[in-house]
Amino acid sequence: MTLYMVFDALERGKLKLNQRLKVSRRAQGMAPSKLGLRRGQTITVKDAILALITKSANDVAVVVAEALGKTEINFAKMMTAKAKSLGMRKTRFRNASGLPNRRQISTARDMATLARRLIKDYPQFYHFFGTQRFSYKRRTYRNHNKLLRAYPGVDGIKTGYIRASGFNLVASTKRYGRRLIGVVFGGKSAKS
């Protein structure tokens, strides 16, 4: 949903791909998956998109949240409202990164709805989800979505992992003229 909000802001002219977003102390302190941004540094919106897609960078998620919502809590409220407007009836966000929070919840159906709406509403940005590698500050990060490399036709969308729910995946492919979206929650390993 964080990326949906970024694409929405780009579409409405609130952000530009080359715009630089400032890193706060809170963003710097995020763990465990991060780029290692430091307070006072900046990152372009385009690099932020790629870092979120390939690395699931939690520090970058907070940078984006603060740029769009002033605070991460306010941004989470904005995401929840947007989710409801998209028909994601059982989703509540409490942070921008997807890190554990007892009151943050979603369903496979709602994540499939989000994927479908990302593809439909922002086709001009969907290609980012097919990014296999992202280089930033002399480091290269590989996309965690190994299906991009393993299965012809898979063109996105996003992986995730937290201890509470295990390995999660929303994947999409276009075959025989039809778009297929699959959602898996609770995998015991990335391979499963």
What kind of feature is each model-predicted range?
Residues 1-109:
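Active-site-adjacent loops and short helices of periplasmic peptidoglycan-processing enzymes
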Residues 88-92, 100-105, 109-192:
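Domain-terminus/edge residues, biased toward the C-terminal soluble/receptor-binding domains
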